[in-house]
Curated annotation (Swiss-Prot):
UniProt modification remark: Palmitoleoylation is required for efficient binding to frizzled receptors. Depalmitoleoylation leads to Wnt signaling pathway inhibition.
GO BP terms: canonical Wnt signaling pathway; cell fate commitment; neuron differentiation
Glycosylation sites: 84
Record-stated family: Belongs to the Wnt family.
InterPro entries (UniProt xref): Wnt
Principal cellular location given in the protein's record: secreted
Any GO CC annotation of this UniProt entry: extracellular space
Gene: WNT-6
Protein name as it appears in the record: Protein Wnt-6
Keyword Secreted attached: yes
Keywords, comma-separated and alphabetical: Developmental protein, Disulfide bond, Extracellular matrix, Glycoprotein, Lipoprotein, Secreted, Wnt signaling pathway
Function of the protein: Ligand for members of the frizzled family of seven transmembrane receptors. Probable developmental protein. May be a signaling molecule which affects the development of discrete regions of tissues. Is likely to signal over only few cell diameters.
Domain of life: Eukaryota
Amino acid sequence: SGSCTLETCWEKMPSFREVGSRLMEQYKGSAKVTGGNDGGTLIPEDSTVKPPSELDLVYSMDSPDFCEPNPRTVHSARRGVGCNSTSMDVGGCDILCCGRGYVEETVIFQVNCRCRF
């Protein structure tokens, strides 16, 4: 007589918070690169940075300085932008408001959400 066993395996997605945290870590550790002459190599602009792997986050152009007026946009005011007044990180009011000060306003709203995952 023989026996039969069945094993089923699957991978579980991490929580959105964990995914966001991992992306933020990669964002903070990202390196600016230029393309190599062979069309497939990425070369770090900073010679002290190791060449990126396929899993590293890289960028090729600097982000615009949103604190400086841009003649291509209609206005450069950052009014109505949500920020975290206690954070000293990228979402903090001091950074988002370019050190020009900000007014704190508490807004409470209710949203019906029928999210499914």
